[in-house]
Amino acid sequence: MSFWNRRSFVSTVAGTAAAYAAGDGWVDLFDGKSLNGWLAAENRDTWKVSNGLLMNDGPRSHLFYTGASNFKNFELEAEVLAKPYCNSGLFFHTRPQESGFPVKGFEIQVNNTAGGEGTYRERKKTGSLYAVRNVYKQLVPDDEWFRMRVLVRGKNVQVWINDVQTVDYTEPVPAVIPPGSIRERFLDHGTFALQGHDAGSKSMWRKIRVRRLPDDAVAPGAAAAVVDDTFRKLIAFGAENYPVVDFHVHLKGGLDVPGAMARSWKDGVYYGIAANLGQGQPITDDAGALKYVESLKGVSAFVGMQAEGREWAKMFSRAAVGRFDYVFSDSMTWTDRAGKRMRLWIPDEVGVIGNVQEFMDTLVERAVGILSTEPIDVYANPAFLPPGMDWDALWTEERLRKVVGAAAENGVAIELNNRYRLPGERMVRMAKELKCKFTFGSNNTGPGDLRRCEYGIEMIEKCGLKWPDFWVPGAFGGKAIERKGGALRG
């Protein structure tokens, strides 16, 4: 029997999903007993029903819903369990096809721990609107049921994993589809499909239900971002597997969590929301650190610790620091050879530099010490100099090589900092040569200077950086505190 005849057959004998409709408009798509209303493509035996669960275990196969299947605006809920290293997902606005990955519609990603195949490393995690609005943080563990909720109204898509919202995307008109992406990845209408990605990916599904919404339904307040060159590049980089994450976002100057998340979703940049911890900073002890981590519980963002000054390692315990997703610091606060503590961005603390070469040699020495001994994952504001100093002249090849070499040797990623446009191109090229990883970072003072990785994009294009050159927490040998936890108190 051909694929299309099978589709007609299954639709005819199993178009009974409507029988499960509840009074509030919800319709069960899975009866808990059979594959009625569904059609498996490519490798039919991959999909099975057992103990009330819809399961995939076998070679690649996509299971298409074939009931009353022309959905435009809708709300869908499902409960999902992913086994270790599972790559799966739910497609919407798609259509049945005989083989391959769906060429129409969008996918809500299910991937907690799948690493990828061959040299490819999948960065897009559960809750992503795949390759359009990506989630880079693992939000749920393997072997645990979680709820997926998808709400599509007009040009707006919203996604929740359990009670955590991961996506609020409003598609521009016309849709922006980057090169290499499926050409029919735009909001339209169609059916649903579940993904069996490969033989090693095993997932379970239950309680799959949907309710139609009016064709003219709209999401209150939804507005598409302005489509400019940066918008196009960010979507393209996300589709190409660059982890588009700004790890240096601060809740300052009136920027709060709702405001930050609205910007993140609109711009298509995932965030690491970081607090300043250390001597003279808003957080100076474990209690404050733990309170901050708890304040971001239920938010789809990395939780970052900006370690300020050189005293921080003795102020916080390993247990408290371990609650953060990553730690970053810079070489902007240090004590000179005469015992003078200074913050380089404050002219009154720096004062008049009598011997510039000695100042630079001390800075290099301090930076190498920070990178070599402190348990940090990212070197932020890299190679910063006080205002008025000639960066290109003073950061000689020899000095740069000492600092970059220390970062490479200690597995510390280097931030491409938007605020200060640092490091310079020479340092980026050297860091790439020495196989350092990179991150994006705004270092904002409020909502007004929260950026879109523009300087990082510039360095990608000038220096030929590729997606494997970029760091994400947990992808390259674990956290720094796991390697250098002994530097911390307790």
Residue map of PLM features:
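N-terminal secretory signal peptides and thylakoid transit peptides that target proteins
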Residues: M1-T16
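Short, charged, surface-exposed secondary-structure boundary motifs
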Residues: T119-Y120, P282-I283, D336-K340, G448-R452
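An N-terminally biased module of ancient metal coordination in phosphate/nucleic-acid-related enzymes
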Residues: V226-E311, V378, P382, P386-E398, ...
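Charged catalytic cores and adjacent phosphate/nucleic-acid-binding surfaces used
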Residues: V226-N241, W391-G490
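Extended substrate/RNA-proximal surfaces in nucleic-acid metabolism proteins
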Residues: D285-E409, E461, L465, G485-R489
